[in-house]
Amino acid sequence: MLTPIAYGLAIVLIALFAFIGLRFLVVPRPAAAGYGVAAKEDGDPAYLTIKGQRDFTLSLVGAALLAFSNAHAVGWYMLVVAIIPLTDTLIVLRHGGTKAVAFGIHFATAVAVLISAALMFAV
């Protein structure tokens, strides 16, 4: 019973990582606004593209681990990946974003990723 839940949550989260990466690649400025810190109109869009390609590539690593590795490897991946939304929480708070976005999106995502890691270690 626990295995489908563990893998299901991991699949959903990895798909979310891919979506975020693709969004930053396709529509970078709206993606930045959704992130919680709006991009400056005169700012260099290369940094948004960098974020997009890194998030998307990281999702491919997770997908490869899901497909070709074991649950513990995916658990370690999720544990390490949880650092990203945790630091995103701090970035949003330090750069003028709202607490609602910082905690409601980024911190909540970190909690979900940590739960996923725990579930993957448990199966």
What kind of feature is each model-predicted range?
Residues M1-Y7, G21-V26, Y47-L60:
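Hydrophobic alpha-helical transmembrane segments
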Residues M1-L9, A64-V74, A117-V123:
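Helix-coil boundary and interhelical linker segments in multi-pass alpha-helical membrane proteins
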Residues A10-A32:
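N-terminal signal-anchor/start-transfer transmembrane helix
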Residues Y7-F17, G52-D55, G75-P85, A110:
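Residues within membrane-spanning alpha-helices of integral membrane proteins
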Residues F68-S69, T87-F103, F121-V123:
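Membrane-helix boundary connector in multi-pass membrane proteins
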